[in-house]
Amino acid sequence: MQEWIILAAAMLATGCVAGVLAGLFGIGGGIVIVPVLESALGVLGVDPAIRMHVAVATSLATIIPTSISSARAHHRRGAVDLDIVRRWAIFVLLGALLGAWIASQLHSRVLALIFASLALLVALKMIFMADSRNLTDDIPRGPWVPVIPAFIGCASSMMGVGGGTFSVMTLTLFNQPIHRAVGTAALFGLVISLPGTIGFVITGFNDARVPVGNLGYVSLIGFALIAPASVLTAPLGARIAHAFSARRLSLMFGAFLIVAAGRLFYRALS
């Protein structure tokens, strides 16, 4: 009983932190939720082969309400580019469905290494290349452009994150101010998390290794504990984000990703 109380408290705290980070960086909070959930599932004795799948799926489910809360807070400050969302949304959505299917076919250890590697690359870019030359002066147009949002959706769904991890980096490369990139990424979180969650529910529905209290790979207990806390704290993160300069926000984002990536590398390789 005491173990369950500790785990419940840890998940509530994770939801609070994830909500603040969702508002602060537009990331949906998944990059915090996934490692914590993976650890909690290990304590509960969930099969290691599907532990990461459950963590990623549950993270995506919690990002649905969190991204709505975060995007609304940023939109009130005029920091959501709805034109980009309209042009990219369908490709992000299709990529998210593909990512959920790919993730369901991989072993948890492989999924964790992919998660950590991509997070580390994004972190290095944000820290060491934040002031570097942009790829273009504006969002590009052309027949090849859908590949970009499709990759964002696919990679984000595989990792259980809301899209901010890749959306913020991509939009800043295309000369978008980081505050607007963060706000726009928050809305992409909904576009990614909804189809991604559905994909994980379907692919995990008949998996006999799934623990009791799950809907497919989604832990309903984890969702019930994390989601409300993250929704309540997301607006606070948005207010904090607009209090920092663009450079400082980039450095904070990069440092945060390095810590998260390092921890996952350690767990996956140990």
Task: Describe each model-derived feature in a short phrase.
Residues 1-3, 42-54, 101-110, 270:
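Helix-coil boundary and interhelical linker segments in multi-pass alpha-helical membrane proteins
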Residues 24, 34, 76, 105-106, ...:
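Helix-loop junctions at the membrane-solvent interface of multi-pass transporters
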Residues 73-87, 106-113, 134-139, 239-249:
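Interfacial helix-loop-helix linkers and transmembrane-helix boundary segments
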Residues 92-93, 97, 108-128, 218-235, ...:
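Selective transmembrane alpha-helices of multi-pass membrane proteins
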Residues 101-108, 205-217, 268-270:
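Membrane-interface helix termini and inter-helical loops of multi-pass transporters
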